[in-house]
UniProtKB/Swiss-Prot annotation:
InterPro entries according to UniProt: Ntn_hydrolases_N, Proteasome_alpha, Proteasome_alpha-type, Proteasome_asu_N, Proteasome_sua/b
Keywords: Cytoplasm, Nucleus, Proteasome
UniProt subunit comment: The 26S proteasome consists of a 20S proteasome core and two 19S regulatory subunits. The 20S proteasome core is composed of 28 subunits that are arranged in four stacked rings, resulting in a barrel-shaped structure. The two end rings are each formed by seven alpha subunits, and the two central rings are each formed by seven beta subunits. The catalytic chamber with the active sites is on the inside of the barrel.
UniProt superkingdom: Eukaryota
GO biological process: proteasome-mediated ubiquitin-dependent protein catabolic process
CDD domains: proteasome_alpha_type_7
GO cellular component: cytoplasm; nucleus; proteasome core complex, alpha-subunit complex
Lineage: Eukaryota, Metazoa, Ecdysozoa, Nematoda, Chromadorea
NCBIfam families: PRK03996.1
Name of the featured protein: Proteasome subunit alpha type-7
Keyword Cytoplasm: yes
Amino acid sequence: MNRYDRAITIFSPDGHLFQVEYAQEAVKKGSTAVGVRGKDCIVIGVEKKSIPALQDDRTIRKIHMIDDHVMLAFAGLSADARVLVDRARIECQSYKLTLEDPVTVAYISRYIANTKQRFTQSPGRRPFGISMLIGGFDHDGTPRLFKTEPSGAYYEYVANATGRGEKPVREYLEEQYSEENTVDEATTLKLVVKSLAQVVPPGSQNIEIAVMKKVNDELQQRVLSTEEIEALLKVVETERVAAEAEEAASKKK
């Protein structure tokens, strides 16, 4: 095996590119991120890990705006993400200057994926150790959500997760996602919080959430405050307790 993981451009006999697989392992050690596409909104939530007491938490951001209508979250190496975020922002500006239209979410997702793929095929480089959830709105007001992998693969989803808690969160989303649960901002927010709760300890200090939605043909985006997240967690907990009580009562009958 050691002969085949020394260079990024060498396949193993059974078809593996080990450096790409190692990059995927870096993603699996990253903070959990989840994205959900609602009827008229995109909600992205990420796990916030504890930081040193002397560190300014404003320098720790897992959710980034790359244009007025596109945002992303990532899991993996923060330094790698910073490089790709900067490249994506420049590409958004270049696209708008050239074509006089904002980028589509699919275009910028493909651009990021292509950049990642080039780093899996060039000697003297290494793959980006990050996976990204990219959400936003196209010109016609359609919400879109994409996920990119270290290999350069990218796909569109209605909901997905990445990072260390990807598997349990994705399984929860597969069970709970529906049009009814994403009919508006409030229901979509609850779904994101409940899915993160599968792997993240309760508490507003452990979660960061950003919302992008279309209101009267105008896009609005914001990051929820600690107070808003705390209130949302209380609502979710109240609903959970009520559901458990109802289930217990039905069993007694």
